[in-house]
Amino acid sequence: MKTQLLSFVKGILAGLAIGLGGFLYVLMVHFVQGELGRVLGSLLFAVGLFTVCTCMLHLYTGKIGMVYEGKQTKDFYISLPVMLIGNAIGAFGFGFALWAIFKDTSVMETVNRICTSRATLVSFDDFLAVIVQSTLCGV
């Protein structure tokens, strides 16, 4: 149980880190016009990933690939959904906090534009393919 709680907490922190990386991406797209903003945003998104790696946080997308090794313990398999829920809580919590801060600003318009364009792209994909790719994180 202690292992699962640690995985849950580290999952929440990983979700917060990825939320931070995503927010840095949006800020760059918002404040630096054109392709340069997207490139800088992509580089700054790595801040979230770097935080996950250096702090040894539990990010589902980083752990799911280990399933195919077949050498994991039962606790590892149990911790996957626990960390996924933690990731979601951390990312949604960070997103909600940012929404509360920036809801009446032009930054939120940029967030809406980016999310809408991404959702439009995914909506043309096959439903089963989207579910499989999102669950296995492209593995």
Predicted features by range, described:
Residues 1-139:
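Alpha-helical transmembrane segments and their helix-helix packing motifs
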